[in-house]
Amino acid sequence: MLILTRRVGETLMIGDEVTVTVLGVKGNQVRIGVNAPKEVSVHREEIYQRIQSEKSGSAPEGGNF
């Protein structure tokens, strides 16, 4: 895992077309903005897991959604 330090307003690049910008920090929460082409899906991990569970027809681990 690559670990980076960024300040509010700073950006990192993923490949040539995806940018992740730190928008704000408040306590233990970090707000980030992601710019990516329409063909690149961007989801929070728990949403991605739900989508994958629904595709396979199984219930997600950890409870009901």
Swiss-Prot record:
It comes from Shewanella piezotolerans (strain WP3 / JCM 13877). InterPro entries: CsrA, CsrA_sf. A key translational regulator that binds mRNA to regulate translation initiation and/or mRNA stability. Mediates global changes in gene expression, shifting from rapid growth to stress survival by linking envelope stress, the stringent response and the catabolite repression systems. Usually binds in the 5'-UTR; binding at or near the Shine-Dalgarno sequence prevents ribosome-binding, repressing translation, binding elsewhere in the 5'-UTR can activate translation and/or stabilize the mRNA. Its function is antagonized by small RNA(s). GO terms for cellular component: cytosol. Homodimer; the beta-strands of each monomer intercalate to form a hydrophobic core, while the alpha-helices form wings that extend away from the core. Keywords: Activator, Cytoplasm, Repressor, RNA-binding, Translation regulation. Transmembrane segments: none annotated. GO terms for biological process: mRNA catabolic process; negative regulation of translational initiation; positive regulation of translational initiation; regulation of carbohydrate metabolic process. This is Translational regulator CsrA. The keyword Repressor applies. NCBIfam families: csrA (TIGR00202), PRK01712.1 (NF002469). It holds the Pfam family CsrA. GO terms for molecular function: mRNA 5'-UTR binding. It is found in: Cytoplasm. SUPFAM superfamilies: CsrA-like. Belongs to the CsrA/RsmA family. The keyword RNA-binding applies. It comes from the Bacteria.
